[in-house]
Each structure stands twice: as C-alpha cells, then as structure tokens.
Amino acid sequence: MRSVGALLVVVGLVGPAPPLAGAQSGLAGSKQTGTQTASGPAGPTQTSSQFRVCADPENMPFSNDKGEGFENKIAALIAKDFGAAPTYIWWGQRRGFIRNTMNATLKEGRCDFVMGVPDKYDLVATTRPYYRSTYVFVYPKGRGLSIRSLDDKVLKKLKIGVHLLGDDYNNPPPVHELGKRGVVDNVVGFNTFYSAENPPSAIIDAVAKGTIDVALVWGPIAGYFAKQQRVPLELVPIPSVKGDLPFAFDIAMGVKRGNAALHARLTAVLDRRQAEIERILRDHGVPLLQPASGVR
C-alpha cells in the first residue's frame, strides 16, 4: 500500500493496517486539476459547483491522474449525485498525506474529502464504510496448491512474496504471523515505491511467471492485477488468527472533522449508491467481504 498498505496504520501509513487507499507514493507536492482543466482553490463542497478530492496521481488500482482507479470512479459517482464536478488535488499518499491535504493549515484545507481510509481513522471524520476487504493468498490455479491457512505446512516449502510497506519497510499483518510460525527464510519482499509504473503489480506478475509460488497481498491490489494476467490465479482470503492484527478492514471516506453537513450528505449518497459502488469495486477485482460495521 505504498505503504500498501493504504492501511498500515493507516492504510498505507505506518504499522500493520491496510493501505490508505492503498499505497504510499514517493511523490511530493501537489497539483490541482478539474475534470479537464486546472483550477484554483474551491470553496466548501456544500456551496460550490466543485467537489474537491485529495488523491494520489499514481496509485492504481485506487487512483491515478487519468481517472482509471476505482476510487476515481466512485468519487465521480458521488460528485454527480451532488450535482458537482470532481476536482482533484493530487498528493502522494505517504506520511503526512492527511496533514498536507485535508488538514492543511488553509482556511478550508486543500480538499473536501479523501477516499479509502480505515473506518474510525482518528485524523478525520469517517463515513460509514462503503466496502470491506482482506489480505489474500494469490497462487496459480491448476498447480496443486490449495492454501487456506497460515498454518498450512506447505508454506515452509514455498517461495512466498510479500509487500514491504512504507518508507521504513513495515510489514503487513500476515507477514507478522508468518514470522511467528518460523516462516522467514523463504519470504521475498517486494517494495511499492513508484520507480516504475504500477509497482504493486510486480508481486502478482511474479506469481504468474512462477518466480514465486504464492503471494500474500492486500485484496484490492491482488484482485485488480490478477485480472490482468494471462495465467489464471486463485485468490483465497487469509482467515483471521488470534492476535492483535486483523487481516480484514472496513474502508470508509474521510471528511474534515467538524464538517457535519458534508458528512451527512456523503452518508446519504452512500445509502443511495451502494449497489453502484459495489459494481465498481467488483469491476476492478476487489474481493469483498460481508460488512463488519455498517456497509449496506
């Protein structure tokens, strides 16, 4: 989640959560663009024809500056419901993402809301979750593998790929659990920094090519890039284990604390558009779980 986490402690920030949307970019600075042309700062969404979204310009499958990510599609759906035009403020999703965007020391902040934050993330006011996903095993179909648990003894014999998250190379929750089981020497780390296009895809490419036998990956990343492979891949949710680190997360939208009006409007839109949102998620290969806290 570049933190690949866009949930590590924040989806992508630090610690074992999933990715804030999904990754942590090495990009710095920001640029603001509308649906077609650049524009200056907009006022609050409630009174503006613009709908300001802070997002990462190079963080597929979540978002990019071409509007191809599932968060781009969902943001466009919400903006349409508001009768507004989506306007993006691009900022690399890394440490300080919320501080430098929504909570920037500007009168209105840089944007009105962000996508893809963990439910109840304390730097913002979160909406009800609009989806729930999980870390998954990814391995080729038809090669005799049937991994359903981190306790499967075959994991000690396979080459396992994992994402290393964030600037300090934090590991996602399943990797902590592998370590507890003594599965260490056969684990290969893949970084998520953007020195090349779509770096999170490298781990899925490696599974398809046979460079590694199985990968443990955040579901939205795994599902999206697995769909692009010629080799059919199996995605199996990693079941929870006893401990402090969950593998599945509820994902919400975040608005600036105190903006009750926008929070209420977003909640109403989510209620109206949940079926369409789920179609977008499924179209992008996101593995969806039953909600834990309020997805309808």
Locate the predicted segments by residue:
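Signal peptide processing junction and immediate N-terminal pro/mature segment
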Residues: G15-Q36
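Bacterial N-terminal signal peptides
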Residues: G5-P16
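Extracytoplasmic small-molecule ligand-binding "clamshell" domains
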Residues: A38-V117, Y121-D122, F193-E197, D283-H284
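Bilobed "Venus flytrap"/periplasmic-binding protein-like clamshell domains
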Residues: P57-M60, D65-D81, F137-P199, P220-I221
